Amino acid sequence: MASASSGPAAAGFSSLDAGAPAGTAAASGIKRATVSEGPSASVMPVKKIGHRSVDSSGETTYKKTTSSALKGAIQLGITHTVGSLSTKPERDVLMQDFYVVESIFFPSEGSNLTPAHHYNDFRFKTYAPVAFRYFRELFGIRPDDYLYSLCSEPLIELSNSGASGSLFYVSSDDEFIIKTVQHKEAEFLQKLLPGYYMNLNQNPRTLLPKFYGLYCVQAGGKNIRIVVMNNLLPRSVKMHMKYDLKGSTYKRRASQKEREKTLPTFKDLDFLQDIPDGLFLDADMYSALCKTLQRDCLVLQSFKIMDYSLLMSIHNMDHAQREPTSNDTQYSADTRRPAPQKALYSTAMESIQGEARRGGTVETEDHMGGIPARNNKGERLLLYIGIIDILQSYRFVKKLEHSWKALVHDGDTVSVHRPGFYAERFQRFMCNTVFKKIPLKPSPTKKFRSGPSFSRRSGPSGNSCTSQLMASGEHRAQVTTKAEVEPDVHLGRPDVLPQTPPLEEISEGSPVPGPSFSPVVGQPLQILNLSSTLEKLDVAESEFTH
């Protein structure tokens, strides 16, 4: 029978740690007799990272459970828990809802609550089902769409799992990512849920991960914890570059092994080398992105979270137009029924559009969820970004890690840092180095109330403000006399001694502006004659001194 329990987070996860009772069917694990519990002598693993290993036949195993069996257990468990939850009346989320753990046993022969299946017996646990139902509703995900995306077709395993050794699955419609997480990360997420709930209520538009469910598959005395999140990188869009950025420089370069992959994940030092000028966004988009990053970092800092990254994939639209189209690699959507409703605020563009709307202009062109940008070559880009790896708190282990690293290296360059400093450095790197505002071009028709003063210098080169006159495109054309002199007159009044440059700074080699236009009569002004100007200055000086 399905059972539910509630209690503190630690108590909730203590049930996760307990293995299946000895002698029960669950102790035999998910794998059938045709699959060995561990690597056999004939099939030895050729690659192992953390709990994840791949044998010579290409079969992935996680905690002695094959990937195919794990995918089947996940789909059976989610189908049951979402279906049973739909029969319960909707209500407001209560505090105790964040600590509820529901458990259901799946014997291979089936039961009055579960269907028969061809895997070994396993137990499936669901954490905070009512709270996560609210999160899914907040993002516009209906129960039938959630089930259809995750359970109608086999999950697709992603080979590029990263250095953590986690398993990654993506739903067949590209909507959701399923990731295996460690016990401490799952425990931290459960403790984080009340604050996460409050933050999403205040602002659902965020670059933070969007969590849709937290589950555990218990088999063979092992607990495999998984989290369902939004998918940042659609497979329907070809990515040309991918970066994992922290704002740190210590060991922040992709390894040679990583570079050999089809789409390597580069790091901070690689970005500084590949794109030293940064990525250029229009003013409204840049402002919206930086405000979103600032708000998200403040939330992470309040929870003492650090060591997170900005995952950024770049689609080069100009390169894509020149590349031959391959039907084999192009993603084709499932056409058996209309595409399910997309999760709200699930793309990078949607995550920052709330800020862009407050600022005024919003990019309305369809960019497939990416943020439009350009590189220093002027090539059109689409950026797919999101903050990842937030389930790390600044605990004793991290403090100790930073302490010994700081003794050997510059403390400011180490990625494991106190949350406040980490957030500040992260924002500074993203908004000053990675993303930059496209400089506005000066408009030749823009009018100013008054031009710059004639006495101002343009720089160390000694150019007079006549060069500034040409840049502003405006200057009052007036012929003045001694009787018309006013103390506050600026340009066009060479008879005002305090505002004239020293004579020794003016040379015949000084640049002279081209024709400008008078805002009064709209006629071209005559090019200034430097010799005539000097003569007028001499006359004015003699008149004021006598």
Curated annotation (Swiss-Prot):
Chief location bin: membrane
GO molecular function: 1-phosphatidylinositol-4-phosphate 5-kinase activity; ATP binding; kinase binding
Region Disordered, residue ranges: 442-475, 491-518
Compartment list: Cell membrane; Cytoplasm; Nucleus; Nucleus speckle
SUPFAM superfamilies: SAICAR synthase-like (SSF56104)
Expression across tissues: Highest expression in brain. Also detected in skeletal muscle, testis, brain and lung.
Record field: compositional bias (Low complexity): 450-462, 509-518
UniProt keyword list: ATP-binding, Cell membrane, Cell projection, Cytoplasm, Isopeptide bond, Kinase, Lipid metabolism, Membrane, Nucleotide-binding, Nucleus, Transferase, Ubl conjugation
Parts of the chain that traverse the membrane: none
Annotated signal sequence range: none
Disulphide bond pairs: none
Reactions performed catalytically: a 1,2-diacyl-sn-glycero-3-phospho-(1D-myo-inositol 4-phosphate) + ATP = a 1,2-diacyl-sn-glycero-3-phospho-(1D-myo-inositol-4,5-bisphosphate) + ADP + H(+); 1-octadecanoyl-2-(5Z,8Z,11Z,14Z)-eicosatetraenoyl-sn-glycero-3-phospho-1D-myo-inositol 4-phosphate + ATP = 1-octadecanoyl-2-(5Z,8Z,11Z,14Z)-eicosatetraenoyl-sn-glycero-3-phospho-1D-myo-inositol 4,5-bisphosphate + ADP + H(+); 1,2-dihexadecanoyl-sn-glycero-3-phospho-(1D-myo-inositol-4-phosphate) + ATP = 1,2-dihexadecanoyl-sn-glycero-3-phospho-(1D-myo-inositol-4,5-bisphosphate) + ADP + H(+); 1-octadecanoyl-2-(9Z)-octadecenoyl-sn-glycero-3-phospho-1D-myo-inositol 4-phosphate + ATP = 1-octadecanoyl-2-(9Z)-octadecenoyl-sn-glycero-3-phospho-1D-myo-inositol 4,5-bisphosphate + ADP + H(+)
Cross-link Glycyl lysine isopeptide (Lys-Gly) (interchain with G-Cter in ubiquitin) placement: K88
Stretches assigned to the PIPK domain: 66-434
Regulation of protein activity: Activated by phosphatidic acid.
CC per GO annotation: cytosol; lamellipodium; mRNA cleavage and polyadenylation specificity factor complex; nuclear speck; nucleus; plasma membrane; ruffle membrane
Result of knocking out the encoding gene: Survive to adulthood, but bred poorly and display reduced fertility. Failed to form any vessel occlusion after chemical-induced carotid injury. Platelets have defective aggregation. Bone marrow-derived macrophages are defective in actin polymerization during phagocytosis. PIP5K1A and PIP5K1C double mutant mice are embryonic lethal.
InterPro entries named among the record's database cross-references: PInositol-4-P-4/5-kinase_C_sf (IPR027483), PInositol-4-P-4/5-kinase_core (IPR002498), PInositol-4-P-5-kinase_N (IPR027484), PInositol-4/5-P-5/4-kinase (IPR023610)
GO process annotations (BP): actin cytoskeleton organization; activation of GTPase activity; cell chemotaxis; fibroblast migration; focal adhesion assembly; phosphatidylinositol biosynthetic process; phosphatidylinositol metabolic process; protein localization to plasma membrane
Entry's EC annotation: 2.7.1.68
Gene3D superfamilies, sorted: 2-Layer Sandwich, Phosphatidylinositol Phosphate Kinase II Beta
Cited function: Catalyzes the phosphorylation of phosphatidylinositol 4-phosphate (PtdIns(4)P/PI4P) to form phosphatidylinositol 4,5-bisphosphate (PtdIns(4,5)P2/PIP2), a lipid second messenger that regulates several cellular processes such as signal transduction, vesicle trafficking, actin cytoskeleton dynamics, cell adhesion, and cell motility. PtdIns(4,5)P2 can directly act as a second messenger or can be utilized as a precursor to generate other second messengers: inositol 1,4,5-trisphosphate (IP3), diacylglycerol (DAG) or phosphatidylinositol-3,4,5-trisphosphate (PtdIns(3,4,5)P3/PIP3).
Subunit and partners: Interacts with RAC1. Interacts with TUT1. Forms a complex with CDH1/E-cadherin, CTNNB1/beta-catenin and CTNND1 at the plasma membrane upon calcium stimulation. Found in a ternary complex with IRS1 and DGKZ in the absence of insulin stimulation. Interacts with DGKZ. Interacts with PIP4K2C; the interaction inhibits PIP5K1A kinase activity.
Classification via PANTHER family: PHOSPHATIDYLINOSITOL 4-PHOSPHATE 5-KINASE TYPE-1 ALPHA (PTHR23086:SF54), PHOSPHATIDYLINOSITOL-4-PHOSPHATE 5-KINASE (PTHR23086)
Name of the protein described by the UniProt record: Phosphatidylinositol 4-phosphate 5-kinase type-1 alpha
Source species: Mus musculus (Mouse)
Gene from which the chain derives: Pip5k1a
